[in-house]
Regions:
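Domain-level signal for soluble alpha/beta catalytic cores
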Residues: 1-354
Length: 354
């Protein structure tokens, strides 16, 4: 069966209700056992699924409601990390303090639960090797085991590939590696703040890590997600994608998901350099703006992208996850209404262009 034009998906996370945030933090601080938390979350996750289905989203996630954040989940499930010892970007992150080792599924159990409750396509999300190295390598505590960030990144690759095999077995249709660092490097202020001295080296390293993680993967659609990073409804960087477009053309992946609804990403003109065979995940809903876009506004954004990318290669999704960590103060109803508008825009576009 042919894939319809303008399919809809999400990037990963949905806003977490207060009681779900409490579950995650109580589990983290030991006030609730892992088993007790999972039992409660088994009641919560179907709500996240139902929201997406009612909004008309065709490829769904579990809202990442079982996770504290999109990136910390790696350290929570993989041996070798100590929690919240590494201040990175002004926030506490885990740090690698021992050789990392695949111990149990990172996201496969999430997917298996979701597969038992939906017939829709399912997207699984994992952090990229590069973002793990950037966020979880500590210049003092990690160096006895991993003398460089690169050495930690290299050890992440086989762990991620093993998890992708588990995700396929669990029923995932798409594996998306989240790689915000590649796009935030377009901002010279961000590069200076994070001590990025050789941006070409960093981009090449990022591309190499993504290719090592995804090269040769079959039986599941491969995707990466880029964004300008956000916290508390504010972006952490800004700038058009022109600087990184040559790097995107070197990544061996089926779908590249990018922000284009937010003004901080610049205009659609950068899509003139987008890889010619790769599908574009088009961010067409601004997750940082409380304004709920009309379907017509979204259609207009998609049609602007069609000036550069064939309609058969365009997938619709929000710019980013609505709540990459439990701290993000986004409204669940707002997310639903934005997703509903996006699905209606897809319907309008299909009627017009199919």
């Amino acid at each position: 069966m042919a894939t319809p034009l303008f399919p809809t998906t999400v990037i990963g996370s949905l806003p977490r209700p207060a009681w779900v945030k409490d579950l995650i933090l109580d589990r983290k601080e030991g006030r609730l056992s892992e088993k007790e938390a999972e039992q409660w979350l088994d009641h919560a996750v179907p709500v996240a699924l139902a929201l997406q289905e009612r909004a008309g989203v065709e490829e769904v996630t579990d809202g990442e409601w079982r996770r504290e954040s999109y990136v910390k989940v790696f350290a929570e499930r993989v041996i070798g990390f100590e929690k919240d010892i590494n201040p990175s970007g002004g926030l506490p992150y885990p740090g690698a303090v021992a050789p990392i080792e695949y111990h149990r599924p990172i996201a496969a159990d999430e997917i298996r639960f979701l597969r038992s409750r939906t017939e829709r396509r399912i997207k699984a999300t994992l952090p990229s090797p590069f973002i793990i190295g950037r966020r979880m390598w500590h210049p003092e505590l990690s160096t006895k085991i991993y003398p460089t960030r690169e050495s930690l990144m290299n050890d992440c690759v086989p762990v991620i590939r093993k998890e992708i095999d588990a995700l396929k077995e669990a029923g995932a249709d798409t594996i998306q590696l989240d790689e915000p660092w590649l796009s935030v490097m377009v901002d010279p202020t961000f590069r200076e703040k994070e001590g990025v001295e050789d941006v070409d080296y960093e981009m090449d390293l990022c591309v190499d890590m993504l290719n090592q993680a995804l090269d040769g993967i079959t039986g599941i659609t491969t995707a990466i997600h880029l964004c300008h990073a956000h916290f508390e409804r504010r972006h952490g960087s800004e700038g058009p994608y022109d600087l990184i477009m040559p790097a995107l053309n070197k990544i061996r992946v089926e779908i590249i998901c990018m922000e284009y609804a937010t003004p901080v990403a610049g205009g659609m003109e950068s899509l003139a350099q987008f890889p010619g065979e790769t599908k574009l995940g088009l961010g067409c809903v601004d997750h940082c703006d409380p304004h709920v876009e009309t379907p017509e506004e979204i259609v207009d954004r998609v049609e602007k992208a069609m000036e550069y990318v064939d309609k058969e290669r365009i997938i619709l999704h929000p710019d980013c996850g609505f709540s990459p960590s439990v701290q993000n103060p986004m409204d669940l109803d707002e997310a639903y209404l934005k997703l509903k508008s996006m699905s209606e825009a897809s319907r309008i576009l299909r009627e017009k262009y199919d």
